[in-house]
Amino acid sequence: MKESWIRNKNILFLSRVHVKKGINFLIEATANLKTELQGYTINIAGEGEESYINELKQLASKLDVENLIHFIGGVYGDKKWELFKKADLFVLPTHSENFGIVVAEALACGTPVITTQGTPWQELESYHCGWWTEIGTEATTKALKEFLQCTETQLEQMGKNGRKLIEEKYSSQKVAQDMVELYKKVCL
């Protein structure tokens, strides 16, 4: 969990670098908000096919945002957790995820999230800890714009709300309790 909340001007994508992850939407949204995002770093963390990573780098260059977008490769262990904690925002603009464990990891660290309706994370809205958007550049741009208008105090509260969501719905104790209830229903 973040120890303090100071805007670091750091946005994070952390997952496999693959076409289904919608990274192009994040790059295009960055281009749409190029002026507003000056001074920010958008870190793209993850491994993928070199040809696709190069395609994304070319897109960033073509849209003149290569100075904002940084491809940092795969990160694991303590380095991964540090990236989550230092990020002001985590973005997973994916086409489809069964769960999206990285969303849970970001929320557990107190980092607000933008993700799409291709994930089962509609609770981001009800817990006020992020944005659950339609899939695409326009929706990603809109959510990023709303993020940029948030104060540090608002973002800190969103981070706390996200941590609360994880503790209430996804802690090991809660999952175990839910499994016991499921077994009772099935077996009795």
Question: Where are each of the predicted segments found?
Answer:
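Short hydrophobic beta-strand element within catalytic cores of glycosyltransferases
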Residues: 112-116
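Short alpha-helical donor nucleotide-sugar binding micro-motif in glycosyltransferases
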Residues: 74-75, 82-87
